[in-house]
Amino acid sequence: MITMMRGFTPALRFNQHLESKGSQTMREVNAEAAKRVVVWFSCGAASAIAAKMAILDYPELPIILAYTDTGSEHPDSQRFLTDCEKYLNHPVKILKSDIYKDTWAVWQKAQYVGGIAGAPCTGALKKGPREAFEDFDDLQVFGYTSEETHRANRFREQNPHVMLDTPLIRHGLSKSDCLAMIERAGIELPAMYNLGFKNNNCIPCSKAKSVGYWRLIKKNFPDQFERYAALCETLGKDGV
């Protein structure tokens, strides 16, 4: 867990370090500033390739691949995780909330599934375990692709204490590039992709807004669809 030291935030320290390095590459600056690299593996194609890039980019630093298990993803995610451990020749450390079993437990407790205030499950099952694990000198790697520069910028603005690296953006890799690289490596993509979903997210993901997404959920996971619909009806207008 990150703790602030006499008002000297990691972001301030990192920015000062960056400003002093002139023409050094971002990789070189990152390697000098960090004591370890933590790659946030999400059981998706992009995060798997981001892990591959990080391992290649930072051979001089300890690498930790960490996965925050929400308890609500497709069971095939475990198979993909195991395949990626073999592909990367590196173990994945599994982190999980000490309080909540899955997204359903969070929604029931919060009496809220998502909306303007965001989704409570993200904070409880993803952000919470991540923040409990991260440290002051970590270089944190996320699998933002070349199409997601805006998301990476927003993360930096909202998390100024984090030293963030986005190797897919640095290397100009798109989501389709990542999918192709996984397939070329002989790894079967997570089942959710093969069912037509764009991401290997929870079933269901309360942040999803598209009609197409919910049609796929209803088609492929009718029990979860009906359970979610019943929960939203029970919570009423205050729950969504």
Question: Can you describe what each PLM-predicted range is?
Answer:
Residues 2-240:
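Nucleotide-activated chemistry modules centered on ATP-dependent adenylation/adenylyltransferase
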